[in-house]
């Protein structure tokens, strides 16, 4: 389901504070490590790199203008697909 328009987009407060600190020059421009896959990407995030957790490790995500409005978690898959395995030793 989509989020109600009257509520507006969501991003974790700690993530917004880190982005603002980087844009103001208070923090060095290095990747921001986050577990917040649910946060919406805002236009102020463009050009920054986030390390988004996929349940196992942090994956680097460089934000471009096409990503605005999407969630951070959309760009980091949580599951690996190894294909439908053929049975070993099966002959036709």
From Swiss-Prot:
Gene Ontology terms for molecular function: rRNA binding; structural constituent of ribosome
Listed PROSITE patterns: RIBOSOMAL_S19 (PS00323)
Keyword match Ligase: no
InterPro entries registered for this protein in UniProt: Ribosomal_uS19, Ribosomal_uS19_bac-type, Ribosomal_uS19_CS, Ribosomal_uS19_SF
Known role: Protein S19 forms a complex with S13 that binds strongly to the 16S ribosomal RNA.
Domain of life where this protein originates: Bacteria
Recorded name of the encoding gene: rpsS
Name of the protein described by the UniProt record: Small ribosomal subunit protein uS19
Gene3D superfamilies assigned to the protein according to its UniProt record, in alphabetical order: 30s Ribosomal Protein S19, Chain A (3.30.860.10)
Entry's Gene Ontology cellular component terms: cytoplasm; small ribosomal subunit
UniProt keyword annotations, A-Z: Ribonucleoprotein, Ribosomal protein, RNA-binding, rRNA-binding
PANTHER family registered for this protein in UniProt: RIBOSOMAL PROTEIN S19P FAMILY MEMBER (PTHR11880), SMALL RIBOSOMAL SUBUNIT PROTEIN US19M (PTHR11880:SF8)
